Amino acid sequence: MDFRLSPEEEAFREEVVGFLAQELSEAVRLEYEERGLPGPLYHAFLRKLGQRGWLTLTWPEEYGGLGRPPIYRFIMVEEMAKRGVEYRNVAESIVAPSLMLCGSPQQKEHYLPLVASGEAVFALLYSEPHAGSDLASLELQAGSDGAGYTLSGQKLFSSEADMAHYAWVASRTDLNAPKHRGISIFLLDMKTPGVTVRPLISMAGDRRFNEVFIDNARVGRESLIGEENRGWYYVAAALDFERATAGAAMFIGNATYLVSRMIDYVKDNPAVQIGCPELRSKISGRATELEVLRMLSYQVLSLMSGGHAPTY
């Protein structure tokens, strides 16, 4: 297998590098570094990506996308991370793929253009006081009366709920089913009566996360994503593809950024090399490992382009 980028892919990388040099300002980087998560300047930058069609790089053309292979999204995300700013976009990475998979025609028509432009901010509402890494143990309930649903419960550690227009909410719709089978997904307008967002302030004054209280918030049946009680499978499918593309690219880009800073530090401080003669070997070892990870990611992306799931 040839692990090199094709001429077209390499040209796209160069285009991304040029764009980031012009549009990814120091102010955006500092905001992200301070918050550790997207802020207002970051979301303005995402809208610029949307204007170039780069939020829909891999979307099918029928949904207004460019229909590019997954490697193009990987390239963009990696280049951002190499500059100290991770690509974090719940709308594009979780919401849009799920809507394409199981959304109604009306949901696709309404929400996909908002995702493509970057105009709407979406928050993930998964974690709860008693359901963190064990998502299937969530307790927030969505009771149905035939015409719609009433949502009640609490969500924790949502990173963008304070800025979000909409939320992607995992809720329990069947209390008697096995815990993985009684979950449904809803799209919730954050202005819905009964929704309250409060910052979770750490001992260090960090305000990056929020808790969300949902008290008898009413949504119509059109807010249900796909089939009732199938939410767990929709979440799992979306996360598989996200880990294989943006997740891997962010990790590799971040590590490349840190290694490059380490190299610059050593160059600027010769005494460090004298005091730690094995440092050169350690740094080169990390750089080699990163290249191996990049090649493994390219292999997975190649499988995805061939129609295989990333867990193949």
What label would you give each PLM region?
Residues H43, G50-E119, S159-Y166, L290, ...:
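Internal helix-loop-helix
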Residues L140-G143:
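A structural signal for short hydrophobic beta-strand segments in well-ordered beta-sheet cores
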Residues M1-R13:
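Intrinsic disorder at enzyme termini
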Residues G148, S152-R198:
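A short core secondary-structure module
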Residues V28-G36, K267-R280, E291-Y312:
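C-terminal helix-coil-helix/basic helical segment that borders enzyme active sites and/or dimer interfaces
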Residues L5-P7, V195-M295:
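Glycine-rich beta->alpha junctions and the first turn(s) of the following alpha-helix
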Residues A131, L156-A161, M203-A204:
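Glycine-rich phosphate/pyrophosphate-binding beta-alpha loops
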Residues G118-Y126, V169:
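A short, Trp-centered hydrophobic/proline-enriched beta-strand micro-motif
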